[in-house]
From Swiss-Prot:
Taxonomic source organism: Clostridium acetobutylicum (strain ATCC 824 / DSM 792 / JCM 1419 / IAM 19013 / LMG 5710 / NBRC 13948 / NRRL B-527 / VKM B-1787 / 2291 / W)
CDD domains for the chain: DPCK (cd02022)
EC number: 2.7.1.24
Family to which the UniProt record says this protein belongs: Belongs to the CoaE family.
GO biological process: one example: coenzyme A biosynthetic process
GO cellular component entries: cytoplasm
Catalysis performed (reactions): 3'-dephospho-CoA + ATP = ADP + CoA + H(+)
Enzyme class, UniProt record, top EC level: transferase
DPCK domain span: 3-201
Pfam families: CoaE
Protein name per its UniProtKB record: Dephospho-CoA kinase
Chain residues that bind ATP: 11-16
Keyword list, A-Z: ATP-binding, Coenzyme A biosynthesis, Cytoplasm, Kinase, Nucleotide-binding, Transferase
Amino acid sequence: MLKIGLTGGIGSGKSTISRIFKERQILVVDADEVSKEVLKEHPEILTAVRNKFGDNFFDENGEFTRREFGNFIFNSEPHRKEYENIIMPYIKKDIVRTMKLYESLNENVCVLDAPTLIENDIYKDMDINILVWVDKATQIKRVQKRDGMSEDEVIMRINSQMSLEEKKKYVDFIIDNSGEFENTIKQIDRIMQSVSIMKGK
């Protein structure tokens, strides 16, 4: 089974590319969804979070306020790293288990959609890696429109991530998602042909 890593930055349109793969009947593992599932399945993760970061991110019913916590760690690289050290082993284990299952079912291709594919070295376990790239102006505009943030807030978020230019060094293919949707589709088709993704599909 061909394992493909798909990554990008905030506002790059990675979710759109992921959806296109799904529409092409290609299996996609969404690392963000996996992270939500492991939180449900492994209560010890939230115990570790509470021990490390305190009670501020739990409501009066003891429920984890995921969005508030996300905003908190997004603005602090040391805190984000501490959280990733807690949760990432569970995420990686679940991803490996899911991909092994798909392989045992004789699936030809599986795409892993992961925003921190490179930062957490998951790209090394993939056969091919793809970056969804956009220019910075487009990135800022899209996030402002989607999330209602100020330009300064968006720039701060972008700067808290590994830059798309840096990510380019680690991937095999780049999809320029700055332009027309039709152009993005053509690029995906070319990549799919190059790695024979359509074989058996």
